[in-house]
Design a protein with these regions (language model features):
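Conserved cytochrome P450 K-helix E-x-x-R motif and the immediately C-terminal K′/meander segment
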Residues: 24-43, 293-328, 349
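Cytochrome P450 heme-thiolate monooxygenase catalytic core
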Residues: 2-12, 76-83, 98, 114-268
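Conserved cytochrome P450 K-helix/beta-meander segment immediately N-terminal to the heme-binding cysteine loop
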Residues: 340-366
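Cytochrome P450 proximal C-terminal region
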Residues: 4, 8, 39-40, 126, ...
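Cytochrome P450 catalytic-core helices
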Residues: 263-290, 385-403
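N-terminal membrane-proximal hinge/A-helix region immediately C-terminal to the signal-anchor transmembrane segment
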Residues: 1-95, 101, 116, 123-128, ...
């Protein structure tokens, strides 16, 4: 083990003697296993050299995570981030005052009464998708969940119906899939363009921008714009504190951000929820009884526990832009990324008793602790968290009301990286019988 001291007074957490090339291979092939190995050897903070992210400090200590998320202007968003592929107008790419202004503008339509108005839309999409499910025959749930969350977000964000909805439904999934891969791969040399996901994403994004530009123009000219409840219409009606509106480019990039951040992650969490519930029939019995009685507390706790035990996002990170950042006993120099390992933190027995046990009751009657981070933390906490939670809650409520979820004795499904999100390796297989 080597604990390096850099020029000045910078002191980094322990690093590994594993060569950088092997570190990179471990991070690419199985990042979570690699981080677990380093955590078991070096503790809750260690230094690595990662592909794409470069020199990075990985932490899994709740107190240090709180320090990081309240570090203010000493840090910016982790580099690189999804803003690299979504565009400079995406909230992922914005910093400082511009980020705060955009967040203030977009928070109202994604919280409270506006999102409750979408609940029936979720019910309708769940029932339309599940109407053709086979009875008693096992199938992977992740693709149906993807279709449900895609349809919901396209209708809620764009107000799309009919041919517009069909066109977006064809266009968005391949764009999100290749974008997830591009986010984890640096741009390749020109010679390798045919296999470069960044190049493929650029083509898909150009098609998206051209089509969505037309939808924005159409919405702006809609004589009923003031009556519309979709997020595109709300963006067009909204202004910053200085009275200026969002530009068309900003709107297009922010809509793409919502699709990228809110579609795949929500669907993947739902697939994990179904995977977990099949292996815990006692939890399902409690959930069904609660649904039949019109309650929701145990279901909400179950969603929190799914997100704790099966976080779909690897980390919440920041990039040090000050001369250095003091974090616990460490002094991290400018240019480093600091990554909070969500999976490691959620498995910390000092934060969550018996973390290996799937136990929704740990969240009954209490708010999640600060160590619970499926949506990230600080000023960059997922702005769509309330929308995603509503969508997961209504989806599970509807499925449990309509179907009996058949239990299984099969082994738990393993993690599988889909690029940005970690999904069940067999797609969250389920079997159902109509109630």
């Amino acid at each position: 083990v080597n604990t390096p001291t850099l020029s000045g007074e910078a002191v980094l957490p322990p690093t590994t003697s594993i060569p950088s090339t092997i570190q990179g291979l471990g991070a690419v092939v199985s990042r979570r296993h690699f981080f677990r190995y380093l955590h078991d050897r070096h503790g809750s903070a260690f230094t690595v050299n990662l592909p794409v992210f470069g020199p990075s400090v990985v932490i899994s200590d709740a107190a240090m995570a709180r320090e990081l998320f309240t570090a203010g202007d000493q840090v910016e968003n982790v580099q690189p981030n999804l803003g690299r592929i979504l565009g400079t107008g995406s909230m992922f790419a914005l910093e400082g005052a511009r980020h705060r202004a955009r967040r203030k503008l977009l928070t109202p339509p994604l919280h409270g009464k506006p999102i409750r108005s979408y609940e029936q839309m979720v019910v309708d999409e769940v029932r339309a998708e599940s109407a053709s499910w086979p009875t008693g025959i096992e199938f992977a749930s992740i693709e149906p969940m993807m279709r449900i969350t895609l349809n919901v977000i396209l209708r809620a964000v764009f107000g799309a119906e009919g041919s517009e909805l069909d066109r977006l439904r064809d266009m968005i999934p391949p764009m999100v899939t290749v974008g997830s891969r591009a986010a984890t791969v640096p741009p390749l040399p020109r010679l390798l363009r045919p296999i470069d996901p960044n190049h493929r994403y650029a083509r898909r994004n150009a098609e998206y921008r051209a089509y969505v530009g037309g939808l924005i123009t159409k919405a702006r000219n809609d004589s009923h714009l003031d009556e519309r409840t979709d997020i595109l219409a709300i963006m067009l009606r909204s202004t910053y504190d200085d009275g200026s509106p969002m530009t068309d480019d900003e709107i297009a990039e922010e809509l793409a951000t919502m699709l990228a951040a809110g579609h795949e992650t929500t669907a993947t969490t739902l697939a994990w929820a179904l995977e977990r519930l099949r292996r815990h029939p006692e939890v399902v019995r409690e959930l069904v009884a609660e649904v039949d009685a019109g309650g929701s507390d145990y279901r909400h706790a179950t969603i929190l526990e799914v997100q704790r035990s099966r976080p779909v996002i690897d980390f919440a990170g920041r990039h040090v832009v000050a001369d250095h950042l003091d974090l616990g006993e460490w002094r991290i120099p400018k240019g480093y990324n600091v990554l909070v390992s969500i999976a490691l933190l959620h498995d910390d027995s000092s934060e969550f008793a018996r973390p290996e046990v799937f136990d929704p009751t740990r969240f009954l009657g209490t708010k999640p602790p600060s160590a619970w981070l499926p949506f990230g933390g600080g000023t960059r906490r997922c702005i769509g968290a309330a929308f995603a939670t509503m969508e997961m809650d209504v989806t599970l409520r509807t499925l449990l009301a309509d179907f009996e979820l058949m239990p299984t004795s099969a082994r738990s499904e393993r993690w599988f990286s889909r690029g940005v999100a970690y999904a069940p390796s067999r797609g969250g297989r389920i079997a159902v019988v109509p109630r």
